[in-house]
């Protein structure tokens, strides 16, 4: 009998670091299941989760403050290996009898760590060799406090020029602490260090693979829904597309996909969705032409949040009407992913002990009485894309740039009109087409066009024209929390501008947005 892919599992306790989700993603990439819980989890909950090992993540607080977060005492008596990272190392040191103090030399950025003792955590890990023969590592630091004394039973494993305790270890108890961040790519050997902990020290097997995730999801969905029918709101986005493919494998024609064309999609997107999922993959899919309904409800509204709510509410109305026609549908499938689940719980610095449910379809009415099927709720976005590839979905679709839920409704500034949407989708298609042609699309993180509700004078031949303005937006980012505007070649921008103005009657001027995030947001609305 094959093993459950959740049999070996790592518990990551979150103290509020911006890098905490990165730790979880790195552990998953190694091939081991893990979950992210708040630092104030109870002993009973840890026992219930039954982790193979525990990682204490970083955080913005100071261990020297009396009310700052601490790991539950049970972490140190549970009998499993523990790794503390940055703040996690500091709270481990303080809780086990060592000392922590505010450092006069704060470290933020690259640092060279010298290994001065053997440890299972650093087995076969080095970037270079120092003059004294010790291994050196290039790592990423981000800390103001530092360990001033290690607990009894620990040895100092690594140091930097300004940090005497860069890493510590108690090999007997399998407790380890590192002051740097192995989860970020700037720490070159970071993945190897985490693999040493998860695989060699915790003895986890690599059971968490794309193929095993698919098999597990299909088995669970079959058991959950039995012979019942399931409905899915298919948008053509990554998450709902992967859910559709998983359910199709699990229950075949018992799945009905509802695709709502709201008139706010990208050029030819509706037909592409129908061709791919209906004709190519053979899914049972219903297309609802609802452009007039959405645009009529949006008429006269210019406030961004109000537009979002209208689009969401009309979608619910349309989806509910179609669902009522399917008498035997007992389940609603959703593309909820793990970051949604994390965000729906209280933040790591709050007081929620339990991960709470999250519904990514905004407020479907309770009276619909449909059970929820959420096969992606354990997965990060990169994992969803990988299993999408395994399921046969095309790379270009899975790795397409993000598109907002309200679609062009929030890329048209102010009131939404059919004329504006038609102009915008054509201009956007030209921009994206040229990015692909010039091999730039995969080198930027997100690119799109924005419709501005202002007119500008132009000249076409001998005639004066007075038409609309669009803005090109293109950014580069790692996490979408911060972003820099893309320094696209001037010749390329000129080409895109000329094509848009010459090929689209109704646009007289193209501008390029050179705002970073912060202070601007990536989307305009």
From Swiss-Prot:
InterPro entries: Class_I_gatase-like (IPR029062), GATASE (IPR017926), GMP_synth_C (IPR001674), GMP_synth_GATase (IPR004739), GMP_synthase (IPR022955), GMPS_ATP_PPase_dom (IPR025777), NAD/GMP_synthase (IPR022310), Rossmann-like_a/b/a_fold (IPR014729). Pathway: Purine metabolism; GMP biosynthesis; GMP from XMP (L-Gln route): step 1/1. Keywords: ATP-binding, Glutamine amidotransferase, GMP biosynthesis, Ligase, Nucleotide-binding, Purine biosynthesis. Residues 9-207 form the Glutamine amidotransferase type-1 domain. The active site is at 86 (nucleophile), 181, 183. SUPFAM superfamilies: Adenine nucleotide alpha hydrolases-like (SSF52402), Class I glutamine amidotransferase-like (SSF52317), GMP synthetase C-terminal dimerisation domain (SSF54810). One of its GO terms (cellular component) is cytosol. Gene3D superfamilies: 3.30.300.10, 3.40.50.880, HUPs. It catalyses: XMP + L-glutamine + ATP + H2O = GMP + L-glutamate + AMP + diphosphate + 2 H(+). ATP binds at residues 235-241. One of its GO terms (molecular function) is GMP synthase activity. It comes from the Bacteria. The keyword Nucleotide-binding applies. Its EC number is 6.3.5.2. It holds the Pfam family GMP_synt_C. Residues 208-400 form the GMPS ATP-PPase domain. Disulfide bonds: none annotated. CDD domains: GATase1_GMP_Synthase, GMP_synthase_C. Homodimer. Catalyzes the synthesis of GMP from XMP. PANTHER family: GMP SYNTHASE [GLUTAMINE-HYDROLYZING] (PTHR11922:SF2), GMP SYNTHASE-RELATED (PTHR11922). This is GMP synthase [glutamine-hydrolyzing]. It comes from Colwellia psychrerythraea (strain 34H / ATCC BAA-681).
